[in-house]
Amino acid sequence: MATEAPPALTPFEAAARDFVFGEVWRRPGLSRRDRRWVTLTCVAAADAPGPIDAHVYAALRSGDIEIAEMLEFVLHFAVYCGWPKASHLEGVVGRQWARVQRERGVEPTGWPPLDVPSFETGDWNARLEGGRAEFADVNLMPAPPSDTPYRQAGILGFVFGNVWRRPGLTRRERRIITVACVGIDDSPMPLRTHVDVALRSGDLTSAEMDEIVLQFAVYYGFAKGEALSDAAAAAVTPATAVATADAVATADAVTATEAGPAGSPHLEEKR
């Protein structure tokens, strides 16, 4: 946490020291930076001022996350958890970044300059086409029709036409943040979809997803963690997809062998 741990005076404080930081954060299945993304998402959504301040400060002070990356995180978080919560989060980022700069002996400055993404041409139709392509690439399915403001301006024009295409975070990092957000949001379809495509795409492994579930459960509760765990268990990974295809092919071969030549529909047609 980039600060000295206080003495544990309650069962909660002892568990935070011994389990949360003594065990979970030290597990090798995710990098500390990956765990930061899950934790920042959870504390920002939990409306807990103290933990938000502490974890934003620790992420910046440790150097695990740079200020430009933190600001990209705020935008991605806003998409999936809403602008009001993200507005508060960005205010915290500003205050904690100023604190970090002062501690480093630097006069606090404003935000780093923003570059216009190379894909932004000002052409709305090009934005929509880019959004359709990004949606299909991220979600491994065709883009929806742009027949409502939510789908056209929101999903295709902004979420996938802009945010997911931005270079400030890797796609894998956006997956981690999104999985944590949809775990929070109590939306069954986005939860299943984003967990499934994160695994099927190969951006996250099953072992990494299991570690995300544990980190998430610690910071947003084991009840919601169970729902996220169930979604991960039900997801189709590249390995299970290959195993399923092999099993189906083997079963078909066995069936054909047992049926013999007379049982083949193709042979029946030739006769």
Model regions and ranges:
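Short, structured motif recognition centered on aromatic/hydrophobic residues
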Residues: 35-43, 73-74, 174-182, 212-213
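D/E-rich low-complexity acidic segments and tails
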Residues: 247-254
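Long compositionally biased, domain-poor regions of proteins
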Residues: 156-161, 185-192, 196, 207-215, ...
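Short acidic/histidine-centered micro-motifs embedded in hydrophobic/aromatic stretches
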Residues: 73-77, 92, 96, 179, ...
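A cross-kingdom feature marking solvent-exposed beta-strand/loop segments within repeated
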Residues: 26, 30, 39, 51-76, ...
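Acidic, glycine/proline-rich low-complexity segments that act as flexible tails and inter-domain linkers
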Residues: 1-33, 45-46, 50-54, 61, ...
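Short, thiol/selenol-centered motifs that function as redox-active sites or metal-ligating centers
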Residues: 44-51, 183-190
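Substrate/cofactor-recognition hotspot
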Residues: 81-83
